[in-house]
Curated annotation (Swiss-Prot):
SUPFAM superfamilies named among the record's database cross-references: 2-isopropylmalate synthase LeuA, allosteric (dimerisation) domain, Aldolase
NCBIfam families for this protein: leuA_bact (TIGR00973), PRK00915.1-3 (NF002086)
Organism: Campylobacter fetus subsp. fetus (strain 82-40)
Gene Ontology BP annotations: L-leucine biosynthetic process
Coiled coil stretches, renumbered: none
Full protein name: 2-isopropylmalate synthase
């Protein structure tokens, strides 16, 4: 192994999906997986196979389609979890089972209700069983940040002897400071030596996930677990883009360490994840926030015009975030459109290009100026293959007195056009009520987000909804894209309905 290489373990599809409102369907996960492959991550944790049939299917489909990187599934230290993980990743060329058990006193006593000796025995059994499915087993000490270092060494030595190749030390609740993480990792690196790779997985509850990860690297960790845009439950995980660009930018601190990440794919990956999950990075987010390369201060602008390096330590083009210039128009041909897609990082087959080109031409008839971000949103939206059980045909709305609104909707279903109308508390509510009536399936709206894809009065509206439909305990996410915000809302709600029905019918 090259001891200067930092292995990038991306868990956007597993831990990142645990962000409230970030659940994804199988097709969406596949699109992100394909982009992560282009980004050049070393290991992709595709999900938690035992969590649900949907998770198992997504991991299995990704394992069939991704060839150049290692595919992992998480599994508790239980035979049924490990068996599910092994079966889900079986089509992959390079496979890993990532099994874990809690090691902190509070978790062992209150959650597991097990003694330390029992935990070690369970961990060893789990690793040995995982080895019957794959050669590459990773073991995680859940809540390592609050675990006793003597016990950590004892359990890690035992699982390494059982066959674990990677030892992961998560700061599960984001409690530790960089110096504390450094000391823990350094102690473990010195103890384990070259018997296994030491990995870290830091949460961001105190805003220290990236700082703790960088401290871990300096202490000798050679695998970092992270997510795109820092997605994750609670305050999120360490952001992949921040870790990678820090190592690259501060070579004075980290050389000769390096990653194999293709940094020019960072922006495209960030935008795809934001588009699919509906969770936009905050504007001032490092590296990928929309203000990351914006300068409003007159002094800063003057310096930038004279020499960009006066106020920018990273170039926008380094992460593939070139200026959002006008690109194509209504007279642009298919060949020019295909070239633009390649430049934006999309790898589509001929049928997908044709479908996207038709939608692009429709957009050109509605929108005067087309920007890169319009095309990114349009194509990302079109390549997510959700069966179109229902489709919006027409929509008209009007505002009434006392805050009420009405909506009339026509929907295509099984070659039939069904029309209806309803009143609601606001236009969106009226639209959703009509769709419920036409489909005969009522939904409860849990979240509704509006984003302008690009600049201008005629900017595309990207709507993301989160809906719980009757008979389901889980929320379904839908996306809609249109110049008209209410039409985008209708499309998003129908997208969620179609996604719910397609999953229900599997």
């Amino acid at each position: 192994m090259d001891n200067n290489k930092i292995i990038v373990f991306d868990t956007t599809l597993r831990d990142g999906e645990q962000s409230p409102g970030a659940s994804m369907n199988t097709e969406e996960k596949i699109q992100i997986a394909l982009q992560l492959e282009r980004l050049g991550v070393d290991v992709m944790e595709a999900g938690f196979a035992a969590a649900s049939p949907g998770d198992f299917d997504a991991i299995n489909q990704i394992a069939k389609q991704i060839h150049s990187i290692r595919i992992a599934s998480l599994a508790r230290a239980l035979e049924k979890d490990i068996k599910a993980a092994g079966e889900a990743i079986s089509p992959a060329k390079n496979r890993r089972i990532h099994t874990f058990i809690a090691t902190s006193p509070i978790h062992m006593e209150h959650k597991l209700k097990m003694t330390p000796d029992e935990v070690i025995k369970r961990a060893v059994e789990a690793v040995k069983y995982a080895k019957t499915f794959v050669d590459d087993v990773e073991f995680s000490c859940e809540d390592a940040g609050r675990s006793d270092i003597v016990f950590l060494k004892e359990i890690c030595a035992a699982v390494v002897e059982a066959g674990a190749r990677t030892l992961n030390l998560p700061d599960t609740v984001g409690f530790r400071m960089p110096d504390e993480i450094y000391n823990m990792v350094k102690s473990m690196v010195d103890f384990i030596g070259d018997r296994a790779i030491i990995s870290v997985h830091n949460h961001n509850d105190l805003g220290l996930a990236v700082a703790n990860t960088l401290a871990s690297i300096k202490a000798g960790a050679r695998q970092v677990e992270c997510t795109i845009n820092g997605l994750g439950e609670r305050a999120g995980n360490a952001a992949l883009e921040e870790i990678v660009m820090t190592i690259r930018t501060r070579s004075d601190e980290f050389a000769p360490l390096y990653t194999d990440i293709v940094t020019k794919e960072i922006y495209a990956t960030s935008r795809l994840v934001a588009s699919i999950t509906g969770i936009e990075p905050q504007p001032n987010k490092a590296i990928v926030g929309k203000n990351a390369f914006a300068h409003e201060s007159g002094i800063h602008q003057d310096g930038m015009l004279k020499c960009a390096q006066t106020y920018e330590i990273i170039k926008a083009e380094d992460i593939g975030a070139e200026k959002n210039s006008l690109v194509l128009g209504k007279h642009s041909g298919r060949h020019a459109f295909k070239d633009k897609l390649i430049n934006l990082g999309f790898d589509l087959d001929d049928n997908e290009i044709n479908e996207a080109f038709i939608k692009f031409k429709e957009l050109c008839d509605k929108k005067k100026e087309i920007f890169d971000d319009d095309i990114r949103a349009l194509v990302s939206h079109e390549i997510i293959k959700i069966p179109e059980i229902y489709s919006i045909q027409t929509l008209s709305t009007s505002s009434c007195n006392a805050g009420h609104s009405s909506a009339a909707v026509s929907i295509k279903f099984s070659d039939n056009i069904i029309s209806d109308a309803a009143l609601g508390n606001g236009t969106a509510d009226a639209i959703f009520k009509v769709i419920d009536r036409i489909s005969g399936i009522s939904g409860e709206l849990k979240d509704y987000k509006v984003n302008a894809v690009s600049q201008g009065k005629d900017a595309l509206a990207k709507i993301t909804v989160k809906v719980v439909f009757e008979g389901s305990s889980c929320a379904t996410i839908g996306h809609g894209l249109d110049i008209d915000t209410m039409m985008a809302s209708a499309k998003a709600y129908v997208s969620a309905l179609n996604s719910y029905l397609s999953m229900k019918n599997r």
